């Protein structure tokens, strides 16, 4: 069974974090909420989120790390040395994945210096494109380049989560139909 760590920090965007957790858990993917700021965090819209665990070296055992955006959440994720070190390791492993949405492609991936030469999307504006100047910036809703998956922001969180299911080898069509995505 594949395993996923959805990272959170104070100021993380709750839609982006919890949508991914919800969709993956519906498909019975082992998905843990892993905090860099203690068991309980306040999201970007002041919602308390209780993590399953706090980051430690076991983070390296997951198959995928998901980085939600949000300000200052993305900056708080980028300041965690163990997370940045792990992202660098994952970036060169074919069977490990890094998924980032909203501000995190620009803020966290650039901090790890793993965006160079990749096709990457992120939240538009706010100087994020400038942080991604070593990458090829796209406006796709979800962008996949090798083992790095990126997306735009809160409105694309469902598409992002479904793409992560597909990449992990699960059937996103079945889950999306159960969630009535086909009605949109």
Short names for language-model regions:
Residues 1-96, 106-111, 116, 127-139, ...:
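Extended, subdomain-level signal for the structured scaffold at the beginning of enzyme domains
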Residues 120:
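Anionic-ligand binding patches
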Residues 143-148:
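Beta-strand-turn-beta hairpins that frame and shape the catalytic cleft
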């Amino acid at each position: 069974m594949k395993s996923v760590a959805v990272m959170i920090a104070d100021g993380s965007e709750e839609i982006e974090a919890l949508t991914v957790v919800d969709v993956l858990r519906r498909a019975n993917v082992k998905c843990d909420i892993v905090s860099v700021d203690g068991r309980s965090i306040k999201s970007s819209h002041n919602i308390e989120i209780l993590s399953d665990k706090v980051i430690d070296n076991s983070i390296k055992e997951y198959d995928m790390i998901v980085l939600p955006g949000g300000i200052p959440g993305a900056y708080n994720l980028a300041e965690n040395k163990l997370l940045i070190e792990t992202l660098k390791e994952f970036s060169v492993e074919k069977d490990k994945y890094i998924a980032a949405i909203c501000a995190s492609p620009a803020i966290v991936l650039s901090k790890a210096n793993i965006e160079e030469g990749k096709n990457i999307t992120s939240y538009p504006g706010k100087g994020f494109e400038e942080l991604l100047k070593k990458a090829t910036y796209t406006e796709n809703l979800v962008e996949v380049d090798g083992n790095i998956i990126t997306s735009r922001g809160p409105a694309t969180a469902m598409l992002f989560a479904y793409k992560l299911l597909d990449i992990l080898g699960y059937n996103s069509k079945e889950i999306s139909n159960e969630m009535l995505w086909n009605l949109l």
